[in-house]
């Protein structure tokens, strides 16, 4: 009993440390930039009734909403990845690797290129695309059950197929691709309060439903036979939680574009620290995902100033080697 209490206390301590780290990273991100600001200016901006000086305008209209978007995107992608890893019984599952992000991406590109006046419906259309891609992967991988190797193969195939659709649109509509190209790279430039307002409901609903399903995901991760023996409706749980993962991924992709490896790397890092209990893994993944995206975006924005490196490139640079490490370790 003492050991269980110590383990629980340790996990709660990790969550608290992550909360503090996210807040600290956002404060540092507000300070750093081409125009540095002080802590006193940040405090004044947060409580001022009017934004009268340049520093306040930079903090409130540019850096703060961008930080919030980065945190929400990171949380959504990380939790989506954690869910997919349980649902698909594969530690290498990730919204991008298994084609979910590609489905959302294709749907988004269709709107950006063919219906540019309807960009306000991108989140909804991206969700439909993400859900369709997830179901396609699941259907292709099903043969008397789902095996991890088939999930990866089906995901790669679906991602390649949907990626070819994106490429075809970019080729046939070359005169309209500027906005779509910037979106596909995965970046947070020019993100402000309107994007926060669009993303927040998706993130809130998705994260709440994810946490409500945490116990079921923990049971599901034990294996189908064990889960059925414990009374879990396995396929129903898979379908519902796949919907939740698609909602989170679609919300993130619709705002930030195609950012890979967050859903792969973050849950694994947390799993090494706090174990496989999804009651702690999901909130921990959300916080660590937020932390990593805020830090990565800050590095991309500040390190090579005045050139801004999209956060999608930063994540791919560090995430790809980690993915290869996981492949070698699992083999």
Regions found by a protein language model. Give the residues of each.
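Alpha-helical transmembrane segments in inner-membrane proteins
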Residues: 1-331
